[in-house]
UniProtKB/Swiss-Prot annotation:
Keyword ATP-binding attributed: yes
Organism for this UniProt entry: Mus musculus (Mouse)
Protein name stated in the entry: Cytoplasmic dynein 1 light intermediate chain 2
One of the protein's GO biological processes: microtubule-based movement
Residue positions where Phosphothreonine is found in the record: T441
Protein's gene: Dync1li2
Length: 492
């Protein structure tokens, strides 16, 4: 710092007063020293307070629980691609006060236990103290929650044991985590509303803080690292109430068991919903709070059943016992799987896939079936009746439906479908009528015509009667000579 004073002295000599007082030089040197000291202090403080790199988040959960979707949403991406084995992504962390950025590594283990050996690539003995663990539970399938949490907690415990961390170092991690758990203070009491969104925590002196004793079943499974239990798909609670008849008692029973599990591991509990974007920002803030020590001013939330938040260190058995007041058909000590029963699996009846048969083969089969069928009486009786209508003139008239238009002056009754056909009478009438058509004979007043009409009335076949009447009307319109010749032939 001496050269600074010398430089000032030389500058003051030629341009200012010729001689400077000794007292003035001393004060200027002190100001220069304090200026440099403040600059060096600020630089060193920034270096120490820079956001550390190498922080890790390890995520466990069943397949389909939504763990990848959850972390992708926290990352800020709309759609994430699900990987296989061990997925990797990162969370961007920004310190607004110091305008500093860093990335937090996120490792997502596959739901198949076959891939648990990949954990060695995500967390090592050196990086364990920089790791936060998230257990993801699927609230849309609450009957799998406790079994899943126990399974993944065992996998993590097994992996930590395989690291062969020195016992002294492991005990140091456990003591540090237990102290953080015991030193929890309500945000409204301890962190009086910092207006910043995030900021570094200022820890008080150890002399002022008095650690509260741990209760029963609290931190019985101390892993030495922070743990967070995240329940996803909490918007499915309404579906559980409608389809599975869940009541508030069921939801309180689930929450009570989750909170007891969290007490054993010193974990926090948070209900989320990516679909409704519920508690996602809260989850992000709590993660950076536990990982980087940022300010966190949100207290515990237990009012809304689908937006519960229990920070680590806040809960105890007395607070959990409040949920027991709503129990009517279940006891707090009842087994989880005895009350939250897995619904019976509905067997889906899949229609067998049938290959389309070749069209020609299908038609051949139908032809063979028709050939094997015996001829019915209806077919034999109908064939002669269609004989007269086969003539070009009668066929063109369209059958019985066109009779009224052929002879407007003739009133013919419609055939009665209730009268049974007389096969013998039809045959006689058809043959006689064919002979009349071939010879072009017949008279309206002849006995034969009268006989035909009387026979038609006796047989009750209105269709044949209408055809006869139609032909008689046609023949009456013939020339008189044709009528006279036909009458002579009939008499002969």
């Amino acid at each position: 710092m001496a050269p600074v004073g010398v430089e000032k002295k030389l500058l003051l000599g030629p341009n200012g007063p010729a001689v400077a007082a000794a007292g003035d030089l001393t004060s200027e040197e002190e100001e220069g020293q304090s200026l440099w000291s403040s600059i060096l202090s600020e630089v060193s403080t920034r270096a120490r307070s820079k956001l550390p790199s190498g922080k890790n988040i390890l995520v466990f959960g069943e397949d389909g629980s939504g763990k990848t979707t959850l972390m992708t949403k926290l990352q800020g991406a709309e759609h994430g691609k699900k990987g296989r084995g061990l997925e990797y992504l990162y969370l961007s962390v920004h310190d607004e006060d110091r305008d500093d950025h860093t990335r937090c590594n996120v490792w997502i283990l596959d739901g198949d236990l076959y891939h648990k050996g990949l954990l060695k690539f995500a967390v090592s003995a050196e990086s364990l103290r920089e790791t936060l663990v998230i257990f993801v539970a699927d609230m849309s399938r609450p009957w799998t929650i406790m079994e899943s949490l126990q399974k993944w907690a065992s996998v993590l415990r097994e992996h930590i044991d395989k690291m062969k961390i020195p016992p002294e170092e492991m005990r140091d991690l456990e003591r540090k985590f237990m102290k953080e758990f015991q030193d929890y203070i309500e945000p409204e009491e301890g962190c009086q509303g910092s207006p910043q969104r995030r900021g570094p925590l200022t820890s008080g002196s150890d002399e002022d803080s008095v650690a509260l004793p741990l209760g029963d079943n609290v931190l019985t499974h101390n892993l030495g690292i922070p743990v967070l239990v995240v329940c996803t798909k909490c918007d499915a609670m309404s579906v559980l109430e409608k389809e599975h008849d869940y009541r508030d008692e069921h939801l309180d029973f689930i929450q009570a068991h989750l909170r007891r599990f969290c007490l054993q591991y010193g974990a926090a509990l948070i209900y989320t919903s990516v679909k409704e974007e519920k508690n996602l920002d809260l989850l992000y803030k709590y993660i950076v709070h536990k990982t980087y020590g940022f300010h966190f001013t949100i207290p515990a939330l237990v009012v809304e059943k689908d937006a519960v938040f229990i920070p680590a260190g806040w809960d105890n058995e007395k607070k959990i016992a409040i949920l027991h007041e709503n129990f009517t058909t279940v006891k707090p000590e009842d087994a989880y799987e005895d009350f939250i029963v897995k619904p019976p699996v509905r067997k889906l009846v899949h229609d067998k896939e049938l290959a389309a048969e070749d069209e020609q083969v299908f038609l051949m089969k139908q032809q063979s079936l028709l050939a094997k069928q015996p001829a019915t009486p209806t077919r034999t009786s109908e064939s002669p009746a269609r004989g007269p209508s086969g003539s070009p003139r009668t066929q063109g008239r369209g059958g019985p439906a066109s009779v009224p238009s052929a002879s407007p002056g003739t009133s013919v009754k419609k055939p009665d479908p209730n009268i049974k056909n007389n096969a013998a009478s039809e045959g006689v009438l058809a043959s006689f009528f064919n002979s009349l058509l071939s010879k072009k004979t017949g008279s309206p007043g002849s006995p034969s015509a009268g006989g035909v009409q009387s026979t038609a009335k006796k047989s009750g076949q209105k269709t044949v009667l209408s055809n006869v009447q139609e032909e008689l009307d046609r023949m009456t319109r013939k020339p008189d000579s044709m009528v006279t010749n036909s009458s002579t032939e009939n008499e002969a």
